[in-house]
A protein has these predicted regions:
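Charged, glycine-rich intrinsically disordered N-terminal tails and low-complexity linkers that flank
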Residues: 1-12
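Residue patterns forming the tRNA-binding/recognition surfaces of aminoacyl-tRNA synthetases
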Residues: 138-152
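Conserved small/polar residues in nucleotide/adenosyl-binding loops
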Residues: 159-161
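Nucleic-acid nuclease catalytic cores
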Residues: 7, 23-48, 52-137
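Residue-level preference for nonpolar/small residues embedded in alpha-helices
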Residues: 13-14, 82
């Protein structure tokens, strides 16, 4: 399964990406080995790759990513949208204001950046996540099929040619 292979290599590379981030920034990343749950919405949780204490002593999220060379263009103008949304979700769950995201692209290009908390985006995410939890998970109802790229990719993955 391609997803499992991608996940496997992401897990293998995570400590290497974390170490390179620490080498380049001088910041210490502490691994986090526990799920973190939102205080108000216990069905919202985060599994962060690490916690960074920045130069001002503020605790921040650390996320490590790997990307194939085929997806390098998605990193040209910043962080791809799906990772921005993931990090904003994590910031909401953890109650933090900042995250560092580091990526190894194509196996030979290292990038990192800061993502700051966006409360208006977080509000939108929580509304959607609450809606999904109440309307789909609690009622055991499959979500409505839409015309999003993610849905199209999923449906195509079901076809074995």
């Amino acid at each position: 399964d391609n997803g499992n292979e991608l996940t496997y290599w992401g897990n293998v590379m995570e400590p290497i990406i974390r170490k390179e981030f620490m080498n380049r920034t001088g910041l210490k990343v502490r691994q986090k080995h526990a799920m973190i749950f939102h205080e108000e919405y216990p069905y919202l949780f985060a599994d962060v790759d690490g916690i960074v204490t920045d130069e001002r002593g503020e605790k921040c999220i650390f996320e490590a990513k790997t990307a194939s060379q085929y997806k390098a263009d998605q990193w040209e103008n910043g962080v791809p949208e799906e990772y921005v949304l993931q990090v904003q979700h994590y910031l909401a769950v953890c109650g933090m204001n900042k995250a560092y995201i580091a990526a190894l692209i194509g196996g030979n290009k290292f990038v990192f950046t800061i993502i700051y908390r966006d409360d208006s985006l977080i509000e939108e995410l929580i509304v959607k996540e609450k809606e999904f939890w109440e309307e789909c998970v609690l009622t055991d109802t499959e979500p409505v099929v839409d015309d999003s790229e993610a849905t199209q990719e999923y449906l195509l993955s079901l076809i074995h040619i």
